From Swiss-Prot:
Disulfide bonds: none annotated. This is Orcomyotropin. The keyword rRNA-binding does not apply. GO terms for biological process: neuropeptide signaling pathway.
């Protein structure tokens, strides 16, 4: 999960 880059 990467809310700052992909949102996933």
């Amino acid at each position: 999960f990467d809310a700052f880059t992909t949102g996933f």
